[in-house]
């Protein structure tokens, strides 16, 4: 791995991965999803998620992104999935969360916001592989009523 270092003072100039945080928000057996109104993947469905900001925790970022993308408030239940994506220098972290209200709706970032029952999920219109995997894990865990944290590396082959 290449590092940029000053030859005179040996200071290392780090280029670090970006962290994406999000939430699988639940309300009465339904999952909150947003149709992206911005690129990349405009017009496809996702869980509320986005890049972490400075001076916030992972949980704060997931709650903020949920509000920014849906207009609704959430409360974190537990860390749920974490994906390392070294080929794009990102880490994606999703939490299970309770949706605290149904005051959701379109935002600048989302053209549509909707609660989906599991059998209503539009699998061919999911924006990102990490969102799809998180939803698949949720369905598996729901069937056995045991929700576990998963960490996975996704590498291009």
Which residues are covered by each model-predicted region?
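Conserved hydrophobic/aromatic beta-strand scaffold that supports enzyme active sites
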Residues: 3, 24, 33, 94-96, ...
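Acidic, metal-coordinating catalytic segment for phosphate/diphosphate chemistry
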Residues: 1-23
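Unchanged
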Residues: 52-76, 81-137, 146-147, 156-157
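Short connector loops at helix/strand junctions that flank enzyme active sites
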Residues: 16-20, 26-28, 40-42, 47, ...
């Amino acid at each position: 791995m290449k590092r940029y270092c000053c030859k005179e003072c040996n200071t290392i100039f780090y280029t670090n991965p970006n962290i994406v945080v999000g939430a699988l928000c639940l309300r009465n057996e339904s999952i909150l999803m947003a149709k992206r109104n911005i690129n990349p993947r405009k017009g496809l469905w996702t869980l509320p998620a986005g890049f972490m900001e400075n001076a916030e925790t992972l949980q704060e970022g997931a709650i903020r992104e949920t509000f920014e993308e849906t207009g609704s408030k959430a409360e974190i239940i537990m860390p749920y999935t974490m994906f390392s994506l070294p080929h794009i220098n990102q880490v994606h972290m999703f939490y299970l969360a309770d949706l605290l209200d149904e005051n959701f709706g379109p935002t600048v970032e989302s053209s549509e916001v909707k609660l989906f029952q599991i059998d209503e999920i539009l699998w061919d219109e999911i924006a990102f592989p990490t969102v799809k995997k998180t939803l698949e894990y949720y369905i598996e865990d729901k069937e056995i009523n045991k929700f576990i944290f998963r960490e996975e590396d996704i590498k291009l082959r």
